[in-house]
Curated annotation (Swiss-Prot):
Subcellular location(s) of the protein: Cell inner membrane
Species lineage: Bacteria, Pseudomonadati, Pseudomonadota, Gammaproteobacteria, Enterobacterales
Topology relative to the membrane: Multi-pass membrane protein
Primary location group: membrane
Name of the protein this chain belongs to: Glutathione-regulated potassium-efflux system protein KefB
Paired cysteines (S-S): none
Length: 601
């Protein structure tokens, strides 16, 4: 592609995303399926705006690369070591069992056994990009099924290396003996990357951060991600695996959150580009001429993978309520199939339309996953949101709650217990099915579902409720829910959890004044106790705590329109001096009886 062609392609991608994704969300089919449909529309088999699909698909793999880097940042080496059994146990079993079954089925058609083996391995892989995106949307990241799903995906990335090495052996074009020197050099280069990353990355980022220029830090982050990807690609390894390792090496560094913030916008755009490219690659000509074969293949592929994954989840001890989520989210073919099948085709393993048929099957299977997960959600909703059994004694018998609590993690549970202890009628919405299952056993009235869906809020009693308490883990979900409540249920008093000052600013800008920063109050209370241990009278320490709370809240409101770091730092220094003056003035003016609060503790 020439420069002008790339620019035109970029404009078309952005237009397709802007037009298709909001429409898909409104129709309730999800953003991922919206991207795929947009790709079909602008691709060579749709309106034909873009024809060079392979080049764009290769470039768009960077979305997966950025995603794996961010995931690596969330997993330190010790956490990764804890997952070793699920990675090499469940992950290996899934790949081997799925590949064997699918290869056997392909051999029943006109596939040669060598082509069937390659086809089985390629179809056994799942889409890292789609699975992780859906797991995040469904709140599976911290659940048992989500952790197990990530382990399976990680093993699949590791399996890329031997799978690609197997192709020339099956084609009979491999050398009689391996070039051990070349293999040894690649191993040494990989080990060198690990050692260099372990001891050099943090000092380098410390040096860059000292410059104080945010753009340079972002550029260094992009250089690290793209450099790791290119280095691994040069070694013949998975680019996504390379950036994942780079992320893990920085997971315990002080720059982890800053790195994630710098990368996140690029990750989202490139992931969207990847899904659009996959949609563009769908060969509708092959679909039309082999419609029955393709439909049967997609159904069989998804069914086989669900069966294998469900059985493995059961053997691993995953809760029954989470097994279908785990199996469904990994049931599609993956992006690695495009690479593996292209390599096999260059070695003349496939005949006729075999490669095209397999790629169409993979693409359509990816399109089934968002729809399948919606069906799983509906099934879980019916199972866990139905009438309670006769022997259950729920806290709430009234269908018209006074309060709706969104999210029932540690933060939400404290609020819920306080409200129920005071005989308030509440309904809890939670999208982590394992939490729903556990809480209902203890008699809590907890419903499964995504609270950002207006219909679910309405059925939960939002039209009759007085207040809604939002305790979501993700700030984006909180702000989306605030907007929905203000638009559809303006009578509700909105109370929200803020993870920090940034989220608090966003809530204030949205008109939400009743919020709590999750660590602020507990930190203030511990600070008050510290003042008492240092000899300050309990009453005076309590007054100091109240003064600090009022001043900090005032600062929070004043700094909303300010975005420059220098302005915020200057105002923070001014506030600290003001706080010191308040305490000093109070010490001089107040005369207290120091035995008045002796029993405060």
């Amino acid at each position: 592609m020439e420069g002008s062609d790339f620019l035109l392609a970029g404009v078309l991608f952005l237009f397709a995303a802007v037009a298709a994704v909001p429409l898909a969300s409104r129709l309730g089919i999800g953003a991922v399926l919206g991207y795929l449909l947009a790709g079909i529309a602008i691709g060579p088999w749709g309106l034909g705006f873009i024809s060079d699909v392979d080049e764009i698909l290769h470039f768009s793999e960077l979305g997966v690369v950025f995603l794996m880097f961010i995931i690596g940042l969330e997993l330190n080496p010790s956490k990764l070591w804890q997952l070793r059994r699920s990675i090499f146990g469940v992950g290996a079993a899934q790949v081997l069992l799925s590949a064997a079954l699918l290869a056997g089925l392909l051999m029943l058609t006109d596939f040669a056994w060598q082509a069937a083996v390659v086809g089985g391995i390629g179809l056994a892989m799942s889409s890292t990009a789609m699975a992780l995106q859906l797991m995040r949307e469904k709140g599976m990241n911290r659940s048992e099924s989500g952790q197990l799903g990530f382990s399976v995906l990680l093993f699949q990335d590791l399996a890329v290396i031997p799978a690609l090495a197997l192709v020339p052996l099956l084609a009979g074009s491999a050398d009689e003996h391996f070039d051990w020197m070349k293999i040894g050099m690649k191993v040494l280069a990989f080990v060198g990357m690990l050692i260099g990353g372990r001891y050099l990355l943090r000092p380098v980022f410390r040096f860059i951060a000292a410059s104080g220029v945010r753009e340079v830090f972002t550029a260094a982050t992009l250089l690290l991600v793209l450099g790791s990807a290119l280095f691994m690609d040069a070694l013949g390894l998975s680019m996504a695996l390379g950036t994942f390792i780079a992320g893990v090496l920085l997971a315990e560094s002080e720059y982890r959150h800053e790195l994630e913030t710098a990368i996140d916008p690029f990750k989202g755009l490139l992931l969207g580009l990847f899904f659009i490219s996959v949609g563009m690659s769908l060969n509708l000509g092959v679909l039309y001429t082999h419609l029955l074969w393709v439909v049967i293949s997609v159904v069989v592929l998804v069914a086989v993978k669900i069966l294998v994954l469900y059985l493995l989840a059961r053997l691993y001890g995953v809760r029954s309520s989470e097994r279908m989520q785990f199996a469904g989210v990994l049931s599609q073919g993956g992006e690695f199939a495009f690479v593996l099948f292209s390599t096999a085709s260059s070695q003349r393993l496939f005949q006729g339309d075999q490669m095209a048929l397999l790629l169409v099957t993979v693409t359509l299977s990816m399109m089934t996953t968002p729809l399948l997960m919606k069906l799983v959600d509906k099934w879980l909703s019916r199972q866990f949101n139905g009438p309670e059994e006769e022997d259950e004694k729920p806290w709430v018998n009234d269908d018209k709650p006074q309060v709706i609590v969104v999210g029932f993690g540690r933060f939400g549970q404290v609020i819920g217990r306080l409200l129920m202890a005071n005989k308030m009628r509440i309904t809890v919405l939670e999208r982590d099915i394992s939490a729903v299952n556990l809480m209902r056993k203890y008699g809590y009235k907890v419903y499964y579902g995504d609270a950002t869906q207006v219909d679910l809020l309405r059925s939960a009693g939002a039209e009759a409720a007085v207040s809604i308490v939002i305790t979501c883990n993700e700030p984006e979900d909180t702000m989306k829910l605030v907007e929905i409540c203000q638009q559809h249920f303006p009578h509700l008093h909105i109370l929200a959890r803020a993870r920090g000052r940034v989220e608090a600013h966003e809530l204030l800008q949205a008109g939400v004044t009743q919020f709590s920063r999750e660590t602020f109050s507990s930190a203030l209370e511990l600070g008050r106790k510290t003042l008492v241990t240092l000899g300050m009278h309990p009453h005076q320490a309590q007054r100091a705590q109240l003064h600090f709370r009022r001043l900090d809240m005032r600062m929070l409101r004043e700094l909303i329109p300010m975005h420059a770091d220098t302005v915020q730092i200057s105002r923070a220094r001014e506030a600290r001096r003001e706080l010191e003056e308040i305490f000093q003035r109070e010490m001089q003016q107040e005369r207290r009886q120091l035995d008045g609060w002796d029993e405060f503790e």
